[in-house]
């Protein structure tokens, strides 16, 4: 199964594509969609087109996207929601089922700790996918979203279920921290 993860943002939208076979995760691609400094409609169109292109190029079976959190600034929350909507439209237009996860669910599934930092997310994504270098934070979050979705439907959905995959890489989670 191929999963496309999306970390939505108005300026930068991260994406990550992984293949899942049983409990094995394999990196396919990741990166960002950058929007131009332009009016809102142009930026949203760029996100929609970028996501639509990813769906055509990588032919994922499913997609996962982060839910909007309520920010201190209501305007920022509204703009993020619109960017997320443009990304979802690109996914749905490509015929994909779309799952949604909170940031807490994402961090819990990938790191085993709901308050994990960006650097902890990047490190864990790098290790789980055997990457030679760390992806940027937006791409790492998107890859994490795909990993979270892969774990949601089976025993890998809990940190105890992650134990075999971590052990193969010489790692374990102790009190919310990655120990290796």
Swiss-Prot record:
Which co-factor is required?
Mg(2+)
A biological process term (GO) from this entry: DNA recombination
Instruction: Give the subcellular location.
Output: Cytoplasm
Q: Name one GO molecular function term.
A: crossover junction DNA endonuclease activity
Query: What keywords sit in the KW lines?
Result: Cytoplasm, DNA damage, DNA recombination, DNA repair, DNA-binding, Endonuclease, Hydrolase, Magnesium, Metal-binding, Nuclease
Catalytic activity, per the record? Endonucleolytic cleavage at a junction such as a reciprocal single-stranded crossover between two homologous DNA duplexes (Holliday junction)
What domain of life does the native source organism fall in?
Bacteria
Query: Which residues of the sequence carry a binding annotation for Mg(2+) 2?
Result: 66
Tell me which residues this entry annotates as catalytic.
Answer: 7, 66, 138
Alphabetized PROSITE patterns for the sequence: RUVC
One GO CC term of this entry? Holliday junction resolvase complex
**SUPFAM superfamilies with a match to the protein in the record:** Ribonuclease H-like (SSF53098)
Look up the EC number in the record and give it. 3.1.21.10
Q: Which InterPro entries match?
A: RNaseH-like_sf, RNaseH_sf, X-over_junc_endoDNase_Mg_BS, X-over_junc_endoDNase_RuvC
Q: Which residues cross the membrane?
A: none
Main localization of the protein?
A: cytoplasm
Q: Main EC class of this protein?
A: hydrolase
Note accompanying the cofactor annotation: Binds 2 Mg(2+) ion per subunit.
Q: What does this protein do?
A: The RuvA-RuvB-RuvC complex processes Holliday junction (HJ) DNA during genetic recombination and DNA repair. Endonuclease that resolves HJ intermediates. Cleaves cruciform DNA by making single-stranded nicks across the HJ at symmetrical positions within the homologous arms, yielding a 5'-phosphate and a 3'-hydroxyl group; requires a central core of homology in the junction. The consensus cleavage sequence is 5'-(A/T)TT(C/G)-3'. Cleavage occurs on the 3'-side of the TT dinucleotide at the point of strand exchange.
Family that this chain belongs to: Belongs to the RuvC family.
Q: How does it assemble?
A: Homodimer which binds Holliday junction (HJ) DNA. The HJ becomes 2-fold symmetrical on binding to RuvC with unstacked arms; it has a different conformation from HJ DNA in complex with RuvA. In the full resolvosome a probable DNA-RuvA(4)-RuvB(12)-RuvC(2) complex forms which resolves the HJ.
The protein's name:
Crossover junction endodeoxyribonuclease RuvC
What species is this protein from?
A: Burkholderia vietnamiensis (strain G4 / LMG 22486) (Burkholderia cepacia (strain R1808))
């Amino acid at each position: 199964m191929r999963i496309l993860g999306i970390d939505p943002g108005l300026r930068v939208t991260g994406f990550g594509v992984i293949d899942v076979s049983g409990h094995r995760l394999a990196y396919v691609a990741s990166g960002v969609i950058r929007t131009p400094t332009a009016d809102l409609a142009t930026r949203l169109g760029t996100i929609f087109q970028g996501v639509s292109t990813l769906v055509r190029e990588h032919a994922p079976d499913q997609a996962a996207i982060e839910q909007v959190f309520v920010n201190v600034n209501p305007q920022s929350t509204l703009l993020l929601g619109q960017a997320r909507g443009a990304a979802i439209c690109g996914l749905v237009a490509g015929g994909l089922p779309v799952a949604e996860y909170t940031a807490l669910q994402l961090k819990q599934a990938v790191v085993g700790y709901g308050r994990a930092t960006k650097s902890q997310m990047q490190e864990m994504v790098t290790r789980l996918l055997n990457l030679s270098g760390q992806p940027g934070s937006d791409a790492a979050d998107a890859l994490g979203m795909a990993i979270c979705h892969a774990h949601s439907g089976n025993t890998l959905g809990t940190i105890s279920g992650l134990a075999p995959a971590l052990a193969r890489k010489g790692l374990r989670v102790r009190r919310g921290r990655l120990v290796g």
